[in-house]
Each structure stands twice: as structure tokens, then as C-alpha cells.
Swiss-Prot record:
Quaternary structure (record): Part of the 50S ribosomal subunit. Forms a cluster with proteins L14 and L19.
Cited function: One of the primary rRNA binding proteins, it binds directly near the 3'-end of the 23S rRNA, where it nucleates assembly of the 50S subunit.
Family named by the database record: Belongs to the universal ribosomal protein uL3 family.
UniProt-annotated stretches for the region Disordered: 126-148
Organism: Listeria monocytogenes serovar 1/2a (strain ATCC BAA-679 / EGD-e)
Listed name of the protein: Large ribosomal subunit protein uL3
Gene label: rplC
Length: 209
């Protein structure tokens, strides 16, 4: 069954194992997760649990939103996400979801929005090779040929310069190194998409070996 939680990326640090091995980890703070709704096949056509994360001022929410969170006896939330393939009996509306749903050694998937890089060329954006930088070369970092003359157009999916980053990215099969229940913090091995303070969605890995 899937377990999930929402949090914010604090940054990266490192921890040492008992053998002295250094492990780079990402710190994810997962406070204020509240169950807002339990969706069932009878009422919604599918099973899922809806979780709200991080309070926001009531003046920033509309009446339907306020009525929805009132059923869970909580305040309006800034982020609302759903997790499918869950055991609905383990969740109660209005209950808080903490990091102790996970344990050390669990394999998870982390989803976030990657850092925006702005308008970038094909070398940085797609990893293409550059031309010679000297000896009379007039081709350095340009995209190169866009295709043959005959079609009179550029084919779809041609790798070209453009805006890079700012996309939803999921990194699969990351390991949880430590669970700090008191501070509601997860330490995840490796890097996680997004800048500092970015929203990160953590759930049980779908392709765990």
C-alpha cells in the first residue's frame, strides 16, 4: 500500500554511518499534514486520501474551500494533494499525518518542481556537443542544422534552445536514511528536485525492487 506526505525542501547536508561512510542527504521538513477527505469508489469512483499541507490565511481562501476544510475541523491549506492505492482504514478525517508513517530504510519516490534555468542553448539544455573554438571555426555553440531543405519546415521534437527547468520531476527509488519524529523531518539519501523551500511530495516507491 502507498504511504505519502508533503513537505518542504530545507537543503542538503551529510551524515555518517557507524562504519564511517559519508552519505549526502536532503532534509525535508514535513509539518502540518492534515487529512481533508477520504475518497471511495461509491462516492467518487476511485479510492484516495486527500491531504492538505501548510496553513494559509482565511482571507486568501474562498467559501467552497473554507467549507471543505471545515469538515476536517482545520484551517485552509496552501497545498492539497491526493494519494491513491492507500488503506483508507489507516486515515481519519482531520487527523494529522506525521513522518512516522515512514521508517528508516524505506524506498520512496520524491516529486517536485525543478529549478528554473531561464532561456538556455542546446549545449546546456540538451547536452549537445559544441564546435571548435579556434582555427577559423565559425561554429561554436549554435544549434546547427534544423533539418533538410525539402520539407520547408522544422520537424516536431527538434532539440532547440528554449526555457529550461521549472518542470515537475520525479526521482524514483530514494532511500530514507533517518526519520526525526520530534522535528517532523525526513533525511533522504541523494538529491531531490527543487530549490530550497520548494514543495516536495514523498510517497512509497512504485518500482521498488
Amino acid at each position: 500500500m502507498t504511504k505519502g506526505i508533503l513537505g518542504r525542501k530545507v537543503g542538503m547536508t551529510q551524515v555518517f554511518t557507524e562504519n564511517g561512510e559519508l552519505i549526502p542527504v536532503t532534509v525535508i521538513e514535513a509539518a502540518q499534514n492534515v487529512v481533508l477527505q477520504k475518497k471511495t469508489v461509491e462516492t467518487d469512483g476511485y479510492e484516495a486520501v486527500q491531504i492538505g499541507f501548510e496553513d494559509k490565511r482565511a482571507i486568501l481562501s474562498n467559501k467552497p474551500e473554507q467549507g471543505h476544510v471545515a469538515k476536517a475541523n482545520t484551517t485552509p491549506k496552501r497545498f492539497i494533494r491526493e494519494f491513491r492505492d492507500v488503506n483508507l482504514d489507516e486515515y481519519e478525517i482531520g487527523a494529522e499525518v506525521k513522518v512516522d508513517v515512514f521508517a528508516e530504510g524505506d524506498i520512496i519516490d520524491a516529486t517536485g518542481v525543478s529549478k528554473g534555468k531561464g532561456f538556455q542553448g542546446v549545449i546546456k539544455r540538451h547536452g549537445q556537443s559544441r564546435g571548435p573554438m579556434a582555427h577559423g571555426s565559425r561554429y561554436h555553440r549554435r544549434p546547427g542544422s534544423m533539418g533538410p531543405v525539402a520539407p520547408n519546415r522544422v520537424f516536431k521534437n527538434k532539440l532547440l534552445p528554449g526555457r529550461m527547468g521549472g518542470e515537475q520531476i520525479t526521482i524514483q527509488n530514494l532511500e530514507i536514511v533517518k526519520v526525526d519524529v520530534e522535528k517532523n523531518v525526513l533525511l533522504v539519501k541523494g538529491n531531490v528536485p527543487g530549490a530550497k523551500k520548494a514543495l516536495v511530495q514523498i510517497k512509497t516507491a512504485t518500482k521498488a525492487k
